[in-house]
Amino acid sequence: MSDSYVFSSPIIIHPGSDTLQAGLADEEHPGSIFPNIVGRHKLAGLMEWVDQRVLCVGQEAIDQSATVLLRHPVWSGIVGDWEAFAAVLRHTFYRALWVAPEEHPIVVTESPHVYRSFQLRREQLTRLLFETFHAPQVAVCSEAAMSLYACGLDTGLVVSLGDFVSYVAPVHRGAIVDAGLTFLEPDGRSITEYLSRLLLERGHVFTSPEALRLVRDIKETLCYVADDVAKEAARNADSVEATYLLPNGETLVLGNERFRCPEVLFHPDLLGWESPGLTDAVCNAIMKCDPSLQAELFGNIVVTGGGSLFPGLSERLQRELEQRAPAEAPVHLLTRDDRRHLPWKGAARFARDAQFAGFALTRQAYERHGAELIYQM
C-alpha cells in the first residue's frame, strides 16, 4: 500500500474529558457523542477490584454504576489510563461508528494541556492508533486551532469552557501563542459542585455521583449568567424562580441560585480562589501577546465548550471586554449555535482540506522513523 493510496473518509475524534465526539469528516455533525467513561468490575459490598478489565463504556457504564467502578480515561484533557482509552476507542470504532479503523485516516484533537506539559502523550497516542488499530494515517490537531478553523479563522482567541478543562488560548496562524495560554480554575465540575452547595443551603442534599449528575442537568437546564448580578438579585423573587421535576416526582424550585451558580466564572473568589475571572483572563491573555496581534485577537474571540451555553454569558463577556479593550481594538465574539462541537467540526473541515495529506503521518513514515515524527507534522 503506497502513501498515495486513497482511503475512506477520515475518522474525527474529539476526546473530551467528559464527552467524546466522533464521526466521519464528510459528515456535518459528529455521528456519535457519548460519555468518555468506562466501568470496571467491582466486588459488591467490599468495593475491591476483582477484574481490572473494562466491562462497559459510555452511557452503559453510567447505567451500571451500582455494580461497576466508573473511571474517566481522560482527565483534564490528558489520557491517564491507556487501557481504558483503548477500550473507548474500540467502542468508538466498532460499536458507535461501525467502521474499520484500518481503512480510514484517524484525526484526534489535542488539549492545550498536552501541548504545554505532556507531549509524550502524543507519541503514545500515535503508537496506539498505528499498533493497536492499524490506522493507515494519523493526525493530531490542536483543539484550540480547530475551533478557530471551524469558523474560517487561523488567528484569534479561543475561550473554551469545558466540564474538566477551561482555558483561554491565543492562536496565531494555527499555532498556540504559549505566552498567552491560560487555564481557568472554574470549570464545569466546580460550577456543578457550587450549585449543589447552594441547594444544600436550602435543605436539598445532592452529594453522591449520581446526584451530582442530576445537579449538572439542573445547571444546564435552568442556570444563566446575569448581566448585572446586583440588579438581578434585586428583582422580585418570583420573576427569577424556575422549577425542575426530579426523578422521584418532586418539584425543585430554584431562585437566585440560577444566576449565582455560573457567576463563579467571572468571580472565582466565590469559591475562595484567587485566580482571575473570565474577563480578566481574556484580557490578560491578549495583553501577553505581541502588540501587533492584540487587535486581531480582540476582534476574533471564539467561545466554545458546554459551559459557553449559559444564556447571557456571551453578552456579559462582550460588554465587560468592551469596557476593558483599547479603543483601537473593537471586540467581536463569535458564539455559534454549534459551539459545543467546534473542535470536532474544525478537525473535520481540516481533514477535507487539500493540505491535510501533507499534515498526516502515514503508516510507512511511522514504520521508517517512529512515533517521534508526529511532532514534525
UniProtKB/Swiss-Prot annotation:
This is Bacterial actin-related protein. Gene3D superfamilies: 3.30.420.40, Actin, Chain A, domain 4. It comes from Haliangium ochraceum (strain DSM 14365 / JCM 11303 / SMP-2). PANTHER family: ACTIN. May be a dominant-negative inhibitor of eukaryotic actin polymerization. InterPro entries: Actin, ATPase_NBD. Belongs to the actin family. Induction: Constitutively expressed.
